[in-house]
């Protein structure tokens, strides 16, 4: 065996597909899409490992504009060539080329599925688990419909409003949530327009939003947002009107506004807010939510539904990090 390591070439993706199986997970599929020619504008470097000129493995390291403290890293080796040290050598070489990153960042992160060969490899190379993420499907009717609006004495408790995904108010709420749940992987300073394009635009697939407000509109304007739900659904060319079916699960970003509630009960109140919106969403249709363990109030709601048997985990991934420099 004479393994050579070289930069990526144009047809390497097609040649690797001959020796790689189908992508075993969504993270692997996403990482494969990042394999490619060197990019200096958005720093990215890909290396391939070849045996007698035939690619058998590849790896990539690249910057994340939103999370600049670490570089993403990924290595994949053909199944019949694993445990030969190829992956380890690729990663070592990627660490060296990472030193060329304009940011001078050399700390790494990667995402794997629990129990996978990728997880074992990453841990063996010194990466440690930092965050678990789950996609959870919640069944239609999983929660009773909540009471909204005015109480018997005429006072307002909470209200729900449809809000345009281009709303600055909504964008700020989503951004506050996103930043708060990524303390473990700090976010860069991103302009509000870029946040909207990335998370709430037509390009992002967002097509509707609900917000929960803490009361009724007052003379000073609308009550503050306490929770939000943004729906996404991939476009289906066979259904250009994008009609939902009874058992189709919408992809939903469900979150809360940090600090919208005060005092010791803030986490509990945030949980109640997202549970209220979730109850409205699943009245007729199931939904799928991505839940990171850092989303503590939402985790509590989802774990209760899992325990009750009205929700199940669709996928689970773990982000591992290596902060060595």
What does each model-identified segment do?
Residues 1-35, 48-50, 147-191, 324:
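Short amphipathic alpha-helix that is part of the acyltransferase structural core
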Residues 23, 27-35, 40-42, 65, ...:
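Short, flexible helix-coil linker/hinge segments at the edges of structured domains or between repeats
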Residues 137-166, 299-301, 305-325:
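C-terminal "cap" of GNAT-fold acetyltransferases
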Residues 181-214, 221-325:
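Hydrophobic multi-pass inner-membrane translocation pores used for secretion
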């Amino acid at each position: 065996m004479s393994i050579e390591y070289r930069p990526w070439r144009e047809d390497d993706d097609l040649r690797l597909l001959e020796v790689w199986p189908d992508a075993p997970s969504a993270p692997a599929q996403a990482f494969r899409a990042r394999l490619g020619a060197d990019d200096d504008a958005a720093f990215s470097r890909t290396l391939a490992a070849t045996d007698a000129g035939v690619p058998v493995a590849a790896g990539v390291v690249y910057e994340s504009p939103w999370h600049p403290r670490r570089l993403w890293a990924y290595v994949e080796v053909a199944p019949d060539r694993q445990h030969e040290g190829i992956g380890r050598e690729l990663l070592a070489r990627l660490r060296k080329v990472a030193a060329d990153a304009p940011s001078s960042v050399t700390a790494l992160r990667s995402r794997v599925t629990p129990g996978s060969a990728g997880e074992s490899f990453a841990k063996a190379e010194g990466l440690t688990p930092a965050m678990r993420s789950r996609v959870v499907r919640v069944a239609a009717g999983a929660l009773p419909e909540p009471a909204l609006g005015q109480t018997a004495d005429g006072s307002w408790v909470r209200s729900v409003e449809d809000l345009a995904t281009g709303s600055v108010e909504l964008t700020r709420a989503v951004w506050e949530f996103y930043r708060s749940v990524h303390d473990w992987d700090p976010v860069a300073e991103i302009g509000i327009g870029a946040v909207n394009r990335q998370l709430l635009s037509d390009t992002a697939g967002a097509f509707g939003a609900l917000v929960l407000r803490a009361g009724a509109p007052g003379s000073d304007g609308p009550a503050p947002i306490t929770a939000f739900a943004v729906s996404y659904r991939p476009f289906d060319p066979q259904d250009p009107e994008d009609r939902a079916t009874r058992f189709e699960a919408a992809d939903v970003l469900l979150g809360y506004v940090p600090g919208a509630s005060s005092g010791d009960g803030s986490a509990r109140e945030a949980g109640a807010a997202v549970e209220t919106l979730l109850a409205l969403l699943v009245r007729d249709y199931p939904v799928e939510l991505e839940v990171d363990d850092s989303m503590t109030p939402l985790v509590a709601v989802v774990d209760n539904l899992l325990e009750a048997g009205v929700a199940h985990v669709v996928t689970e991934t773990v982000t591992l990090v290596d902060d060595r420099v």
